């Protein structure tokens, strides 16, 4: 009866250990995640963008999206010299080295240390001894500790590569946005230059009419002069913004701050019809989302490692020593000694360290899962924002174009009326100010549309190719 009970206990323990081994050797599988509704519909009744799940906009090579040769040259320079990208590449090298070490941990380790002594007792003949020991140790991975560590190192390498791709995409989008910012500022500077001349002419005309006593008072001349100075202030601000943007772009492409050669805003050709791709395609394209999932996988294997530490560890060590007995030198060089030891260690009480380690690993897994979920939601939000920004800026630009046509005619009409003294100076100044502000706003909205395209491309994982 006692033997039967012992047999049942042994079988039960063996079954529990085998079931535990199965879970310890398990591979990471992607948890369920909600992908429907990640991208919100655009707010316009008639969609300007073609949103479907065909070939995604983010899969297009960046050279096909940004066709300006000057911009392409700046992007190439950034990819070669940007410090964040260079550091990301070094992170990949470090992860590769760690993975190599994790793979080699399955093999035995060997150590060699030689030792020799010369001794003489009471002035007698010197005695020479030497030993050439080789020690080997092998940690047998019975319960997946080394395997989980290796798999964790593998996903860390993938995470490092994903981070490198994410930085690359961010750099490409950053260069494009700054380049287009410079083009916008150049066009605004051109508009301000034209308005500077117009307001100066208006001021001169009012001075002449005041001197000729043709119905223009000093207050009108002063207002025209102030309007002219306001334009000069705007010009100074734009010049400062150009210099600051050039400095930022120079830093991004890894060079000293200097002037940036560039094209013109009106010559830029960017896509106007897109397929965004949704759901899992969005998850696969976004390098930062995939990196967050690889962090989740790493934490999964860390939990496996923490669990495996509760199980016994098998260590096998061996040593071989070539030695002599001393004094006989080369004639009888010595003998070879062998020794082998195997040990099985079962943790019983480790001051709560094993339980604490498992709890920490599980908590880190939950944190990684939350971060992954947030990365998914952030990706969807960025796509939605880019779509809304594109449609909104396009709609505003069309309205402002009509408004500019009206204001240009208004400026011409007020100039003619002022010549015949049939309007006030205030109407003239107001018409000029309204025209300039609307023209500047239209340029800003045109830039916002270009920026939305860049942001949409980046939000869909563009820049990896």
Predicted regions and their residues:
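Terminal intrinsically disordered/low-complexity segments used for targeting and assembly
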Residues: 2-80, 239-284, 458-465
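Periplasmic alpha-helical coiled-coil/stalk elements that build and connect Gram-negative outer-membrane
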Residues: 22, 155, 162-278, 389, ...
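Small/polar, glycine/serine/threonine/aspartate-rich low-complexity segments that form flexible
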Residues: 49-67, 71, 76, 113-135, ...
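Short, acidic/charged, Gly/Pro-enriched secondary-structure junctions
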Residues: 86-104, 113-115, 297
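Sec/SRP-type N-terminal targeting helices
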Residues: 86-87, 103-104, 140-171, 219, ...
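A short glycine-centered flexible hinge/capping loop motif at secondary-structure junctions
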Residues: 209-215, 418-422, 459-463
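Short terminal targeting/anchoring segments
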Residues: 219, 419-444
